[in-house]
Curated annotation (Swiss-Prot):
Gene behind this protein: eif6
Domain of life: Archaea
Protein name as annotated: Translation initiation factor 6
InterPro entries in UniProt: eIF6
GO MF annotation terms: ribosome binding; translation initiation factor activity
Organism of derivation: Thermoplasma acidophilum (strain ATCC 25905 / DSM 1728 / JCM 9062 / NBRC 15155 / AMRC-C165)
Family the UniProt entry places it in: Belongs to the eIF-6 family.
GO biological process, one term: cytosolic ribosome assembly
């Protein structure tokens, strides 16, 4: 299932929310209709949270089935039970965790400037191998792609060799494309898990077909 929605009247819904196959988190300020969209499409428990009183929770967290990572010293409200996941408050000069890490249960790509210590902590928390690289020449890899346990959409600057590498590394189908009427920052424009996909309201029918094809 794929559906258009907005969060706080923004079509860049990925900066306000994060999802996996068993739970989704959304800004505390989201309205009831938006939360209902997330519940119906993603088919998971949707929890309103805040991180350091910010609504931009999608930029500040990453998770897979094994773990969840937020910036060091974060005050989190509404997180609830995480079903045995490892939880890491990562101490690094890079603190936009959701923008700078993209992961599933097979691997994680991280920003090139993470320290060696941080890289080891990320691997231990998420239970996967990590690689420091870019996606389509974008350093903020979490904003350059959207990844689930079934598929991955990356920005259109990603070349064929890179697409093949991503397929092998994450063990999912991978395609390039845009959302929100041509935005290359698909991670900021989409929230998805293996059950459904939410996209910003500016996303065109052609974009939706491509997104649905690779993620649904």
């Amino acid at each position: 299932m794929i559906r258009k929605t907005s969060v706080l009247r923004s079509n860049f819904i990925g900066i306000y929310a994060k999802a996996w196959d068993d739970v989704a988190f959304i800004t505390m300020m989201a309205d009831e209709k938006t939360v209902a969209d997330f519940q119906e499409v993603l088919q998971v428990d949707v929890r309103r949270i805040s991180i350091d009183n910010s609504s931009l929770i999608g930029t500040m967290m990453v998770m897979n089935s094994n773990g969840l990572i937020v910036p060091y010293g974060s005050e989190i409200t509404g997180l609830g039970d995480l079903d045995g996941r490892n939880v890491l408050q990562l101490k690094d000069k890079i603190n936009a965790i959701g923008n700078d890490i993209i992961a599933n249960d097979h691997g994680a790509i991280i920003h090139k400037n993470f320290s060696n210590r941080s890289r080891k902590e990320i691997e231990d928390t998420l239970g996967v191998e990590t690689i420091r690289t870019t996606i389509g020449n974008i350093l903020t890899v979490g904003s350059a792609g959207i990844l689930t346990s079934k598929g991955m959409l990356v920005n259109p600057e990603t070349d064929d060799d890179e697409l093949e590498f991503l397929r092998d590394f994450f063990k999912v189908s991978v395609k390039s494309g845009t959302a929100n009427f041509g935005s290359i920052y698909v991670g900021a424009s989409i929230v998805a898990n293996s059950k459904g996909v939410l996209v910003g309201k500016d996303t065109t029918p052609i974009e939706m077909d491509r997104i649905d094809d690779v993620l649904s």
